[in-house]
Amino acid sequence: MKKTLLVRSYKLILSTALLFFVFPVLAQDAENEEKPKLKLGGALRFNYNLSSWKDGQKDRGGDFGYDMFRVNAEGSYKRIFLNVEYRLYSEAFGGGFLKQGWMGYKINKEDQIQVGLTQVPFGLQQYNSHNWFFNLTYYVGLEDDHDMGIKYIHDSDRIQYQLAFFKNAEELQFGSTTETDPSRYSYDITGRNKEINQFNGKFIYKLGKDRQHQLGTSVQYGGIYNLDTKETGNHHGFALHYEYLGEKWNVKAQGMIIDHNLKTPDTI
């Protein structure tokens, strides 16, 4: 009986000691989550260019110059967070513009909502390429594309899916018939046409012990409003994609079908 009481006493003392040490740590973590956080970053990039089709440049051994300067800001307070990136390129590559800028709300550890200039969930992300020039998909608005809208993300151990609605591309002018401003990071359908009311869905299943194999599919459908005819066409796309995330290797593969139906003066 005495031994039993002694063991119980030891257990009680040990439990009390553990609570004494663990509780302040938990309280500290909770306190840190309540404090506003701000993370600032950026980059400065230069570029050496030697083009085989430019005789003058070949004669002088190429050119070395300024390429891009960027500023990043990430902030959070409780469940609200934001992400902003501004880039300033050389004049030949577009000058300055906002690459992304959105606010978000964390519903829980797996679910969140983003609102603003956020990345379109279509195909491999963030990039469908391994080089400075990106892939052809970037130049048709299907790689690292950012538009104005709202996006829901669920990301769990094995499954990730995203659902989004985008009102339009990055809009800097709000006239009745003004064209989409060229000061944008993303490639979009522009000129006398405007992307409107676009819906996106993306699903990824993670395979392997370390989830290094990611197999997914993406769908996209939206309107294309013509400023001259005041008619709305449409565009839609479907993609299958796979990515291997190894320690030293990264393999990407993607196939897609894209279609555009414009309502220009010569088509109606």
What label would you give each PLM region?
Residues 205-268:
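Detector for outer-membrane/organellar transmembrane beta-barrel domains
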Residues 2-14:
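Bacterial N-terminal signal peptides that target proteins for export
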Residues 33-53, 60-171, 203-209:
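Outer membrane beta-barrel
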Residues 171-228:
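Loop-centered beta-sheet repeat module
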